[in-house]
């Protein structure tokens, strides 16, 4: 993996290290999403949104965590659980009941950073998904709110997030936990996707 990024990037940017360390679960999840054909029909898309809702439901306590909010100003406004819930209502799909395994987990700050890294990073890929949703006549006002471009733009939102993420001081063990949190987040979404498409 060391050949995939310049040495200075690997050493200095946590966001780049996390990208490298989570490449396998990320690629596995992308393949799983494609296999479910979420844009084949509105019903399939609703199942995809249900997984998105459950994932955002998992993350809701992190987006409203006071310690994290001190690090990331306006963090609560980045949450998408309400948008996904509204999309499910638009699509006539019941709101699934999430389990409490992640919400009640005793995540360290470093692990939480990994989970947020995955959630915030997914907003970049959501641009492609949002365009695909248009073929189902869904948009930021109906059915695809959670994929819509955030206020201020996707690129700027991500840039501001990683600028803070990359600047937080973590020791070696905390770096490991951040990577674990990110991998766990990718795997969790895969599990939720399997559940909603079962």
Curated annotation (Swiss-Prot):
Up-regulation conditions: Increased transcription under iron starvation.
Gene3D superfamilies: Heme oxygenase-like
Keyword Protein transport attributed: no
Residues at which heme b binds: 26
Protein's GO biological process: cellular response to iron ion; heme oxidation
ATP-binding in keyword set: no
TM spans (from-to): none
Gene inactivation effect: Mutants are unable to use heme as a source of iron.
SUPFAM superfamilies referenced in this protein's UniProt entry, alphabetically: Heme oxygenase-like
Job description of the protein: Involved in heme degradation. Catalyzes the degradation of heme to biliverdin, with the release of iron. Forms biliverdin delta (70%) and beta (30%). Under anaerobic conditions ferredoxin--NADP(+) reductase (fpr) can provide the necessary electrons; Bfd is not required.
Annotated protein name in UniProt: Heme oxygenase PigA
């Amino acid at each position: 993996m060391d050949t995939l990024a310049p040495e200075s990037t690997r050493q200095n940017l946590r966001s780049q290290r996390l990208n490298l360390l989570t490449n396998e679960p990320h690629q596995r999840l992308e393949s799983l999403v494609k296999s479910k054909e979420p844009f084949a029909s509105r019903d399939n898309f609703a199942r995809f949104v249900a997984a998105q809702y459950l994932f955002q439901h998992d993350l809701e306590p992190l987006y409203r965590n006071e310690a994290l909010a001190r690090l990331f100003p306006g963090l609560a406004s980045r949450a998408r659980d309400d948008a996904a819930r509204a999309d499910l209502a638009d699509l006539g799909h019941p709101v699934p009941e999430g389990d409490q395994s992640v919400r009640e987990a005793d995540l360290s700050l470093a692990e939480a950073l990994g989970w947020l890294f995955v959630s915030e990073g997914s907003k970049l890929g959501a641009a492609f998904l949002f365009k695909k949703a248009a073929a189902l006549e869904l948009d930021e006002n109906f059915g695809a709110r959670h994929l819509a471009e955030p206020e201020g733009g996707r690129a700027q939102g991500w840039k501001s997030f990683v600028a803070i993420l990359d600047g937080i001081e973590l020791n070696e063990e905390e770096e490991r936990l951040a990577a674990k949190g990110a991998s766990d987040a990718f795997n969790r979404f895969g599990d939720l996707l399997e559940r909603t498409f079962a």
